[in-house]
Amino acid sequence: MQIFVKTLTGTTIALEVEPSDTIENVKAKIQDKEGIPPDQQRLIFADKQLEEGRTLSDYNIQKESTLHLVLRLRGGVMEPTLVALAKKYNWEKKVCRRCYARLPVRATNCRKKACGHCSNLRMKKKLR
């Protein structure tokens, strides 16, 4: 039987499958056509994410059904070098108390004309 897989870019892929095919087999066929690794694929049908190890017939997927393909988002811990870089560019700043302009740590006066280049500066508050 033929099913369709719609990607986020709007393209539709036609796949030739059997009702007894597992979700892993479908993901492997998508990898053959699109080059997306199976571990990054998430298949959605009838507002449900399809679990690996189950078959198409388990989800009542019939001929000419459309599955939706979305990519898995990977999260994790930031590397220490990226944290240091974020601190340098976002946290280690001074702020003008009058116009709230962000300034470098070594600044003594504000760079904005709106507050008259005042010297009333404070360190930017840390995130909690």
From Swiss-Prot:
It comes from the Eukaryota. The keyword Secreted does not apply. Residues 1-76 form the Ubiquitin-like domain. There is a cross-link at residue 76 (Glycyl lysine isopeptide (Gly-Lys) (interchain with K-? in acceptor proteins)). GO terms for cellular component: cytoplasm; nucleus; ribonucleoprotein complex; ribosome. Keywords: Cytoplasm, Isopeptide bond, Nucleus, Ribonucleoprotein, Ribosomal protein, Ubl conjugation. There is a cross-link at residue 48 (Glycyl lysine isopeptide (Lys-Gly) (interchain with G-Cter in ubiquitin)). The keyword Repeat does not apply. One of its GO terms (biological process) is translation. GO terms for molecular function: structural constituent of ribosome. InterPro entries: Ribosomal_eL40_dom, Ribosomal_eL40_sf, Ribosomal_zn-bd, Ubiquitin-like_dom, Ubiquitin-like_domsf, Ubiquitin_dom, Ubiquitin_ubiquitin-like. In the N-terminal section; belongs to the ubiquitin family. In the C-terminal section; belongs to the eukaryotic ribosomal protein eL40 family. This is Ubiquitin-ribosomal protein eL40 fusion protein. It comes from Leishmania tarentolae (Sauroleishmania tarentolae). The gene is UB-EP52.
